[in-house]
Amino acid sequence: MPLLIDRPVFIMAAPRSCSTLLFETMSRSAHLWSIGDESHQLIEQFPPLNPLAEADSNRVTAEPLQGAIGEELGRSLRRAFALNLRDREGARPPPEGSVRLLEKTPKNALRIPFLAALYPDALFIHLVRDPKENIASIIDAWRSRRFVTYPTIATANGPWSLLLPPGWRDRLEAPLEEVAAFQWQAANQHILDDLAAIPRERRCTLNASELLADPRAVAERLCRFIDIPMDEEFASGLMQPLPLSMYTLHAPRPDKWRRHGGALQRVWPRIAPLIDRLNASLDAGTPALDAAGPPPDAVVASPDEAERHHDPHSEMGDVGRNSPCPCGSGRRFKACHGRLT
């Protein structure tokens, strides 16, 4: 009998929702397997799932799995996941038996009907983050040029970054804060709508603030939900502070969003109704999101001030000075965004 992926676990979240931190934390369990990173290429190698081929966006329903061609697509994708599985030590699974897959890719927020058809026993974790922090982080991600997903899609804000929701063509010339709010809103709206069709026992919600405040308690809760034991090595590792995730742009700071205060104020009326709906969907005991918009006295830096105080090293991460600049200019980092001043 070939290797079976039993009750895979999908983390569903808008981009920049601390989903990588949650994925890296739970990947330390001896009872979970993953492909080690996000599954962009693994999924989008199939034309019906690729916006640059046959798909129009990252939104995918169960339709591509229908018919004989769809059945073959499903088998091929399940095989691709199985062939790329690794445990926390990087070891391959045995050729037979069953394993539990942990998967996290923000684009999957738009693919729940597809994933539920691909794996009818799948479990889903909906991770939410404070909207001010989340949308501000999406803005930072676009500006960093480290999260470009579709380089051939040109926008007023540079090549398209992060997930590609339906309606993206209408935002090609939009201000960056509108694009960021659009991505946050589309991801969470589709998650809420699609998870409503999933049995209650196969889904749960989590606020990123819980993970940051008490990772041990969150891990214990998720192990119960996933139905796996917490092994001793996993538990002992959670006694230490969580490290920064691999995709962290800036060191965490509670008021970091304030530098985008003016931008957030402009988009807040549009997203406020969804915040109320998200709060209504949270599991009992899950902290609610702050529905209050940025206060009038939020620190708002003008573009010139932001540029003067901009630290390229914090945006670009750990880049060698002789490496190509991540901004895509073609120049070395030391001669571009890494220039010493």
Regions of interest found by a model, annotated:
Residues 104-105, 115-141:
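Conserved phosphate-donor/acceptor-positioning beta-strand/loop module used by diverse small-molecule
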